[in-house]
């Protein structure tokens, strides 16, 4: 069972028992999901079905999608998700947490744990493309050493924001930053 901890949060494999708290804390919250590529879940069964699909990836030899719970250590409650999309020596990274837990450094800690985990897999380049209006996520990424490569025009659709493709920030963490990050992450 995969589990990595920082001072206040852990990233770990999801469990079916996470469905209710994860729906309540994050996946069912329309505001928390506004910058995702899908709508908020409508009920806990939708969250349970998603968790079952995501858990099936854990046993694959080379999974192309890894969704982990972000757990607050004190309460041992799942408060969000960390999504990794490894592909050979590079990966995408995405994260989100409940609005109730924002502003405490949890997303930054979870992102750093994700970077360290990807390094352990031999990943040397990590990228992500948050919506240009998602200032909190962009700030977390900058704290973790990601560098803006510019704006990706009409890059992705965010259903909560409408049907039109939205502009996103092209953020990357390259090999040099990864080596530096490994020394500075503790």
Residue ranges and their predicted role:
Residues 24-39, 59:
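Helix-loop element at the rim of GNAT/NAT acetyltransferase active sites that forms part
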Residues 37, 63, 120-123:
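Residue-level recognition of short, structured coil/turn motifs
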Residues 43-45, 58, 160:
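A short hydrophobic/aromatic micro-motif that marks alpha-helical segments and, especially, helix-coil
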Residues 33-53, 66:
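Conserved GNAT-fold acetyl-CoA-binding loop/helix
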Residues 53-69:
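A short helix-loop-beta-strand connector motif used in the catalytic cores of GNAT acetyltransferases and
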Residues 13, 41, 53-56, 83:
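Hydrophobic alpha-helical segments with strong N-terminal bias
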Residues 1-21, 25-31, 71-186:
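Acyl-donor (CoA/ACP) binding surface of acyl/acetyltransferases
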């Amino acid at each position: 069972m995969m589990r990595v901890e920082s001072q206040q949060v852990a990233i770990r494999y999801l469990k079916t028992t996470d469905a209710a708290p994860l729906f309540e804390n994050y996946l069912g919250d329309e505001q928390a999901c506004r910058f995702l590529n899908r709508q908020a879940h409508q009920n806990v069964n939708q969250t349970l079905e998603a968790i079952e699909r995501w858990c099936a990836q854990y046993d694959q030899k080379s999974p192309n999608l890894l969704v982990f719970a972000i757990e607050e250590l004190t309460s041992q409650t799942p408060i969000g998700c960390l999504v990794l999309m490894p592909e050979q020596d590079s990966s995408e990274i995405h994260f989100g947490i409940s609005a109730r837990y924002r502003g405490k450094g949890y997303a930054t800690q979870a992102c750093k744990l994700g970077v360290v985990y990807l390094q352990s897999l031999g990943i040397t380049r990590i990228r992500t493309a948050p919506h240009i209006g998602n200032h909190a996520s962009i700030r977390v990424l900058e704290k973790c050493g990601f560098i803006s490569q510019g704006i990706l025009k009409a890059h992705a659709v965010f259903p909560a924001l409408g049907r039109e493709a939205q502009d996103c920030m092209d953020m990357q963490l390259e090999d040099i930053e990864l080596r530096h990050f490994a020394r500075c992450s503790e």
